[in-house]
Every structure is written in structure tokens, then in C-alpha cells.
Amino acid sequence: MKEKFVVTGMTCAACSAHVEKAAGALPGVDSAVVNLMLGTMLVDYDPEKVTAEQIISAVESGGYGAKRASDVKQDVHKEQDAALAKMRRRLVWSIVCLVPLFYISMGHMMGLPLPGFLTASHLTHAISQLVFCVPILILNRSYFTVGFTQLFRRSPNMDTLVALGASAGLLYSLIEMVRLAAGQVSGMPELYFESAGMICALVTVGKYLEERSKGKTTDAISALLALAPDSAVVKRNGVEATVAAEDIRKGDIVVVRQGGKIPVDGVVVSGSGSVDESVITGESLPVEKAVGDPVTSATVNQSGYLELEATRVGADTTLSQIVKLMEEASSSKAPISRLADKISGVFVPVVMSIALAAALLWAFVGGQSVQFCLSVGIAVLVISCPCALGLATPVAIMVGTGKAAENGILIKSAQSLELMGRVNTVVLDKTGTVTEGKPRLTDCLAAEGVTQEELLCVAASVEQPSEHPLSRAVTEAAQERHIPLCEVTDFTAVPGGGVHAVLHGQKIFAGNGTFMHQNGVDIAPFSAQSEAWADDGKTVLYFAEAGKLLGMLAVADTVKPDSAAAIAALKRSGCRVVLLTGDNTQTADAIARQVGVDQVIAQVLPQDKAACVERLQKEGQLVAMVGDGINDAPALVQADVGLAIGAGTDITIESADIVLMKSSLADVASAAELSRAVLRNIRQNLFWAFFYNSVGIPVAAGVLYPALGLLLNPMIAAACMSLSSVCVVSNALRLRLWKPKTKPVSSAANTAAIENIADNDNEEEPTMKKTVTIEGMMCNHCVAHVEKALNALPGVKATVDLAAGTAVVEGAVTDEAIRAAVTDAGYTVKGIQ
């Protein structure tokens, strides 16, 4: 089982490494991953071999505090805010004491006057420095208590380095002051009180800036948590009462009025309303909800009145699960961070050894003074920064997963985030992924003497009693065009063939070609067009009255508006795109042509999809699988990265590494783009961290002193250390500016993309006047609809003739733009002259 613990007392990457080592050493613990920024640890353990109490005890034995996250009632983010405010107060008072300390100790070097009583005696001058230094050390005593505690436990951390550096300066200065008081020193000795105080103050400045920056990395999680309402209205025993949102129980009836937030997942049992689901699905338009419809936590009832039965409450709501996924992802570790983790575990002992070795070498080999050697040792201790190494990866991952969630992409682990950027083959399921997963009417061809409106009226009327998906596609098309339907009698469905019924006393047949032949209907006049539709992967339905063919309709699972653009973006990024489907080859090839997929694997049984993915992996491909159905789950697990379309089934989403909440294929390309951006950021952070420590430590040790006479002052070293962590975190925060290059596009834009797939370079020069032949217009309402669509194009003036079935378009516009606009309006362009 996996359980989250809240860990206190960690200050750097070395701390998190020690905590992970302590918990991971217990028998029965499979993995322990610490999130330094959130102060949490996610442990995967066998409860039969080890208990949560033993895990807590192991962490506490290492000098840190630990509690089960379920036992911590206070909001972690509020605790972080309180800790930041406390650190700010500590910093302010440290600076208040540091300014006079710096003036007293260093002012005379700058020609600044000192009070007479300080210049009268060297001892008075030294004591005054001590007086202002001690409050700074007391204010920042945590560096010493934690640092030395961890040193004695043989798990030194960054606090240990600061404590050793400041203590060395303080101890040397105290000894020199005692010698001065005893008269053993003539003149003013070299003291390091200001260095000890400055080191603590500057490190606190850096930690404060770092904590502020780290707080911004969790803004996405905080924003999600803010979506949940604090209270709700519950109806119990017929009486309404306001209760805290966390007190809602499963089965409670929750009342949500206009403008109210829905606090839990549930099902509408009374009322109706328009619900804004954009925070969860990204859908910009409100969704109508009525009795029986599901609703999701954190969504807003924009209008109407809803009563819903709570089905998922507390930690089980959709919002809570999203937050949990984000926290788990930010707590996980990417493979790219392994080297940094290994170095962080031994970094502090190595630095302590380098500091001691440098001081001894300068003393015994270089023949330098004690003050020189002490300055070198302190500088090495305080310039080194394990935090820069430890923060290089997690801050980028946390910002990246948060940014992904803002765009409707839920990434479950850092490993998935890293792998998505390295994927070179994307396998797409067809139905519900590339296509809408719902048949729609695409074409209408009426026989001579029959209008399209008449054909559609007859077709929808006879299909209305049927529950078949193709029948529903026909009736929905008629309803969208506001065509009135007629009642039929003697309705009969013939499995595998079609339906027949009586309309206005005439027997109507509707179905496939075989069904028509069986009932003596001649479909030969339409055979050429029906074959063309079939080649495009469409299902052809014929309609006949009293043995005479009225016309035919084509129904198909239409391509999603952004599929072509998304696939084009994937191909531009160097990915090989494969369409994997159980559908027949003809239909699969037709869809592939529309969206620009070059490789199709069709007629694959559900149980064989995983084998197809495995075969691609054996070819050396890093494979991402995108699907939405239960039959896609094994393939999602087999793939290096599994992506589930958000509208899919629970089992598919559970099997996936990444969940696309908007059900948009464009988000596959966006996930890959974001992953690559995060990887770039991590590499930059790691380079800076390694470069800083690789250069800073030798310089502090004095390697430039023999040639250039350059020796780093401990105060400057402390400032550099503070800024190094801030630089890493600030660089990661740049990811907050990331925006997806590939966005969901309109149907018009998608149609234009499809038209251009065959020959992207074949763009026509715009002409001033064109005549467009349009199919599908049946009334003046259609005329107005088409004119509005065409006139919306920039610089275009269009006039539509219903009788001729044409539109005259004037203006500088390409054929592709005209086709896109007309098709988006729901009609078909047959030709442009």
C-alpha cells in the first residue's frame, strides 16, 4: 500500500536523502520518496511486514519529525505560509543587528567614523562586535541545533556546513578576544564576528527567497484546492442545513442554487441547470444537467436549481483525486535526477573533507597564517550548496505537472513526464480518440423529384423508433436542421438489414444494399456514389417508398475537430504516428487519410492491441499509446507511456500514466511539448548546480590565489550559496510562462487542415469572384446560415441562391477557406469555379 507522511525538519537535499534512506532501509518498504518542497514522503510498503509507526520511528531516529498525513488536520499550504512569515520576521531582526555589526567591524575600512568609546580600546571594539553578533546567532539558532544534531547522527546536511562555518569564525574570534583581554595580543586582532553573523543572515536571505519561490511552484495545487467550497447546503429529513463540505456523507442530498459550487461528485435527483465544467474538462460552454445526469465537484451551477445525491465525498471526489495525482507526481522522481540524488547523499561529508584538506594544505604546504587557513575553510563550507543539486529536478517537475493540470493534462509520475518528451512513436486508438466515437450524418443524396428535406424527413421519421446508433444519427441530423418528423406505424427492425414501417399509408424501407435487394428495390443508379462513400469509410443507408428509391444517406464516425492538427504537430516533432483499430481496413484507411496518418494497423482484436505495442517496442521504438476504451487498457499498460482520453472508462484512466481531461487529441502533442520543456529546464538546472559547485568550491579553496591573488571572503561565499538555490528555483518558475503550441481548433480550421494533407503546397491564388456549388441547403434558413458563415470570412461578400444551390463569393479568399467555412456550417461543397 501507499501512504503519505508529513516530514518536518528537512532543510536541504541531503536531508531528504537521509530520510529516504532511513525509511527505505526498513524491511517491507518497497520505496520511499521525499518531496522536499511539500515536506512530505510517499511510502510504498507491505503493512504485514512493517507498520506506519515503525516508519515514523525510523524517520525520527534520523533527527526529523514525521506524522501520517491523515493525522495532520491543518492545511499544509497554510503551515508553509506561517513558516514563511516566521522566517521573514527572523530575517528582518537579523538585518537590524547585522547593519550596526557591519558598520562597527568594517566601517573604518571605508573611512566611516566610529564612536569615540569604540576607538578608545581594542577590547571595547571587539566586545561591541560580539554584542551585535550574538543576537543574530540566537535568531538563527536552528542552523546550529539542526546542523550539529545531524552531524552527531552522522548524517550532516546544509545546516551542518553553515553551523561549522559560522562556529569556526565565532570560536576563533572568541579566542582572539580572550587573548586580547589577557594582554597576549598587541594591536587589534583579526576577528570574524561579522563573518559569522553575515553568514547566518545571508543564508537566511537565500532560504527566504528560495521558500517564496518554492511556494509559487505549488500555486497550481493551491488554485485547485481553492476551487472546493468550504460549506454546502444539505437536505436531511426534508430540512435544509448548511454544513462544512468535509462533513457531507455519501448518500446525502445536496442543494446547489444558481451561482453555487458543487461540493461533491453526485447524480442529479431533482431540478435542472447549466453547469460550468471548465475547471475539470476545459469545456468552455456550460453543460445542461437534468435528473439522472452526473455532476462533478468544483464545477459551478451557472443557472437553475439542482438537488443531487452525493456519490463521492471527501478524498474520493474528482477534485481530490486530481490534487492527489498532482502531489504524487511532484513527489515522484524522474530517471534524470538519479545522478543528482546520489551526489546529494555524500555531498556534505565530501565538502567537509575538502574544507579541512584545503585549510591544512595552506597551513603546512603553503605556510599561510591561521587567519588565512580559517578563511579558506569557512569559505569552502559555506559556498557549497547541496540544495541547488537537490532542487534542480523536483522544482521543475512540480511546476511542470502544475502547468499540465492547468491545461487539462494530469501527469501521474515524474517518470511519465520525462518519457513523454522522449517518445518517438505515438499509437492512436481510432474510435473515441481520433474520432468522436459517435456516428453522424455526413452526406445526403436524393433521387430525382425528391428534395433533400423530404428525404431527411422520411428517413428520420422511419428511423425514430429505433435505438440503433445509425438510426439516432439520422434523427439527430433532422432535429439539428429543424425538420419536423412524422409518426409511423407497423415499425419492424430486421437485424443485420434495416427497418421498415408505414408512413402516410405507404410502406417505407430503410437499410443497407442487401436489404434493398431483398425487398425488390433497385439501387443501381446510386451504386457509383455509394461505392465512393464506402471507400471513405462511411456506412450507406438507402430509403425507399413503395419499392421506389427515395435516396441514400451516409453515416460515419466523424473525425474530432482537432485530430488532424494534433497529428500534424506530432509528426512535425519527429514522432511516428500509428492508427491502431479493430475496425475494418477500408474504414481505418479512410480515417487515416483524413487526419494524415501514414501507418494503419486494422482489424486488431482487443486482446492483441498490447501485442502490437510490444512489437513496436521490440523495433526499438519508445511508444506512447492513446486510448479511451476498456479494450485499450492492456495496451496502455504495455506502452512506455499510456495516455487516457478523459471521457474514457475508469479502468482505462486507471491504467494510464497521463490523463487528458479535455478528451482532445491536441493535448497529446501539448503533453509532449511540455515534457520536452521540463526536460530542458531540468538539464539547465543540473548544469548550473554542477557548474556552480565545481567552480565555486575550488575557488573558495584558493586555487586562484597563487596565480591571481584572488581569495574568496566567507561573506561573499555565503552570498553565492544563497543565490545559487534562488537561481535554480527561479529558472524552474519560467515554466509557468509555458503555453501549448498545439491547441484545440475549430471544425473549420480542421477541415482546412484535412483538405491540405494531400498537398500542403497546393495553395491557390485568391481570386475576386467565385461560384460555389453547395449541397445540403433545403430552406431559407439554410441560406441565411451559409451566408453568415461565408460573410464571416475576412474581406468576403457572399450571396446564396437556394434554387441554384450555389453561392457567389467575392473577395480575396482561398478555396480551402471557403470549403472550411461551408463545411463547418454543416453543408457540403461540390465544386468551386
Indicate residue ranges for each PLM-predicted region.
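Conserved ATP-binding TGD loop and adjacent catalytic N/P-domain core of P-type ATPases
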Residues: 17, 38, 503-505, 539, ...
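Membrane-embedded alpha-helical bundles of multi-pass transporters
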Residues: 110-124, 152, 171, 403, ...
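ATP-driven catalytic headpiece of P-type ATPases
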Residues: 89, 299, 421-467, 497-578, ...
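Conserved catalytic phosphorylation-site environment of P-type ATPases
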Residues: 230, 280, 339, 388-462, ...
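Actuator/coupling domain of P-type ATPases
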Residues: 54-75, 127-231, 235, 246-254, ...
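Flexible metal-binding regulatory segments at protein termini and peripheral loops
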Residues: 1-124, 223, 238-240, 320, ...
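Soluble-to-membrane junctions at the N-terminal ends of transmembrane alpha-helices
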Residues: 76-96, 146-169, 323-355, 373, ...
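Small-residue-enriched core segments of transmembrane alpha-helices in multipass membrane transport
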Residues: 98, 198, 346-347, 374-390, ...
